[in-house]
Curated annotation (Swiss-Prot):
<dbReference type="GO" id="GO:0001650">
    <property type="term" value="C:fibrillar center"/>
</dbReference>
<keyword id="KW-0539">Nucleus</keyword>
<protein>
    <recommendedName>
        <fullName>RNA 2'-O-methyltransferase FBLL1</fullName>
        <ecNumber>2.1.1.-</ecNumber>
    </recommendedName>
</protein>
<feature type="binding site">
    <location>
        <begin position="230"/>
        <end position="233"/>
    </location>
    <ligand>
        <name>S-adenosyl-L-methionine</name>
    </ligand>
</feature>
<dbReference type="GO" id="GO:0048255">
    <property type="term" value="P:mRNA stabilization"/>
</dbReference>
<dbReference type="InterPro" id="IPR029063">
    <property type="entry name" value="SAM-dependent_MTases_sf"/>
</dbReference>
<dbReference type="GO" id="GO:0031428">
    <property type="term" value="C:box C/D methylation guide snoRNP complex"/>
</dbReference>
<feature type="compositionally biased region" description="Basic residues">
    <location>
        <begin position="64"/>
        <end position="77"/>
    </location>
</feature>
<feature type="region of interest" description="Disordered">
    <location>
        <begin position="1"/>
        <end position="82"/>
    </location>
</feature>
<comment type="subunit">
    <text>Component of a box C/D small nucleolar ribonucleoprotein (snoRNP) complex composed of FBLL1, SNU13/NHP2L1, NOP56 and NOP58 and a guide snoRNA which mediates 2'-hydroxyl ribose methylation in RNAs.</text>
</comment>
<dbReference type="GO" id="GO:0032259">
    <property type="term" value="P:methylation"/>
</dbReference>
<comment type="similarity">
    <text>Belongs to the methyltransferase superfamily. Fibrillarin family.</text>
</comment>
<dbReference type="InterPro" id="IPR000692">
    <property type="entry name" value="Fibrillarin"/>
</dbReference>
<feature type="compositionally biased region" description="Gly residues">
    <location>
        <begin position="1"/>
        <end position="59"/>
    </location>
</feature>
<keyword id="KW-0488">Methylation</keyword>
<dbReference type="Pfam" id="PF01269">
    <property type="entry name" value="Fibrillarin"/>
</dbReference>
<keyword id="KW-0698">rRNA processing</keyword>
């Protein structure tokens, strides 16, 4: 028995195969002609059930970029939420990708091009800013598991080495409108960016001075609860100590980011960190915690401690 339809005889198998080819754009079930004849503009074979015709439809779909059966499939919705971190004022965003975030003090405004996310909470929209640990030593320390940062809502913070205000802006979010962050930066170029950030954030007070000379800006700054230092200078322990003696209350806390190469490029990072800790201890700055910042920063460590701790009660 010869196939019906002469050259289009690959449609043997009836109309079922041809119609499948036309619907799905593949024509694989019983419609071999749908792929070979149809995709080359065929349809000349008339098969017993119109297999060749179904093939023509399949060829069309392929030219438009593939099977059409997934064309209108909707993407599954992703549930997003924000959870409080154990550090007060810091949050974790749960979505397509998890991220460290802070509640944006100035909704609708980003500081350094960071992503902003909006979440409905109790019927109100709340905007959060993602905090990049590759651009912030404090964020890297938090994700690295630091036990305490001592920066929380209503805190007064002295930030040494504020640069253009990337981390300062997140500290501003954490402490809220009732807190204050004094941001000290010596570079005038970075200082201009810092001032622009402070124009929209009323809890940031920019101080364009050298952190080595705290007496030059002592009239601008009151006593603070926390000092954060990211100055990357060979004498940074001395810089922190001078500012602590001038502005940090007894029992206050400090966080210092240490970049080993900036202090001694010939010694190992561990030796540099140990040396800096000894210098801090000589200045009534008692280190309580130390952690490295890998994988976010290489040869960096953050030391957290207390200044002139009160005597332990017996």
């Amino acid at each position: 028995m010869k196939p019906a339809g002469g050259r289009g005889g690959w449609g043997w198998g009836g109309g079922k195969g041809g119609s499948k080819g036309g619907d799905t754009g593949s024509g694989t079930k019983g419609g071999f002609g749908a792929r070979t004849r149809g995709s080359s503009g065929g349809g000349r074979g008339r098969g017993r059930g119109g297999g060749g015709g179904g093939g023509g439809g399949g060829g069309d779909r392929q030219r438009r970029g593939g099977p059409g059966k997934n064309k209108n499939r909707r993407k599954k919705g992703i549930t997003v939420s924000v959870e409080p971190h154990r550090h007060e004022g810091v949050f974790i965003y749960r979505g397509a990708e998890d991220a460290l975030v802070t509640l944006n003090m100035v909704p609708g405004v980003s500081v350094y091009g960071e992503k902003r996310v909006t979440v409905m909470e109790n019927g109100e929209k709340q905007e959060y800013r993602t905090w990049n640990p590759f651009r912030s030593k404090l964020a890297a320390a938090i994700l690295g598991g630091v036990d305490q940062i001592h920066i929380k809502p209503k805190s007064k913070v002295l930030y040494l080495g504020a640069a253009s205000g990337t981390t300062v802006s997140h500290v501003s979010d954490i402490i809220g409108p009732d807190g204050l962050v004094y941001a000290v930066e010596f570079s005038h170029r970075a200082g201009r960016d810092l001032v622009n950030v402070a124009k929209k954030r009323t809890n940031i007070i920019p101080v364009l001075e050298d952190a080595r000379h705290p007496l030059k800006y002592r009239m601008l700054i009151g006593m603070v609860d926390v000092i954060f230092a990211d100055v990357a200078q060979p004498d940074q322990s001395r810089i922190v100590a001078l500012n602590a003696h001038t502005f940090l209350r007894n029992g206050g806390h400090f966080l210092i980011s240490i970049k080993a190469n900036c202090i001694d490029s010939t010694a190992s990072a561990e030796a540099v960190f140990a040396s800096e800790v000894r210098k801090l201890q000589q200045e009534n700055l008692k280190p309580q915690e130390q952690l490295t910042l890998e994988p976010y920063e290489r040869d960096h460590a953050v030391v957290v401690g207390v200044y002139r701790p009160p005597p332990k009660s017996k």
